[in-house]
Amino acid sequence: MLKKYKMGFDIWAMVVFLIIMIPNFIWSAVPAPNDILRTESATKVIDTIGSIFQVLMIFTLCVFINPKRKKLSFTKTIIAMICCCVIYYCCWVFYYLGVTNWLVIMGLTIPPCMAFLFFAIDRKNYISIVPIAIFTVCHIVFGVVNFII
């Protein structure tokens, strides 16, 4: 499978990562009024596994390039990725307005993962699907266990 890819650097993968991380950078510097995300996690092992696969996800998205991918354009998958980012940003707005219900928590959890998945599919970067899937599962478990149940 690796033979189908070349090693390089996909600047757009890094751009997508940074766009998704901007609210996290803001959150690190400016706490929300009802900041439940700063509580101690009950899923530390899952969080560690998730962090490892998040790094692998970004690494595989940025480094492995499928030469058969098309030029980046507004395909259905890129539009889906953008929609996921918009939903994610909207959920951050609600979070900063003090809304911390299950819908907002899942909105902070699932859409960014789906954005990475749609980007990977569009770029034909199938190597990154496994780390994205594992990171997504860990991210959902973290959100559900720590903030919903």
Predicted regions and their residues:
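Terminal transmembrane helical module of multi-pass membrane proteins
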Residues: 124-149
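Short aromatic-rich membrane-water interface segments that cap or initiate transmembrane helices
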Residues: 40-52
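Hydrophobic, membrane-inserted alpha-helices
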Residues: 57-60, 87-88, 110-119, 135-139
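Membrane-helix boundary connector in multi-pass membrane proteins
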Residues: 94-104, 114-131
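C-terminal halves and exits of single transmembrane alpha-helices
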Residues: 79-101
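Alpha-helical transmembrane segments of multi-pass membrane proteins
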Residues: 19-32
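Membrane-interface helix termini and inter-helical loops of multi-pass transporters
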Residues: 31-43
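Membrane-interface helix-boundary motifs at transmembrane edges
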Residues: 2-8, 66-75, 122-129
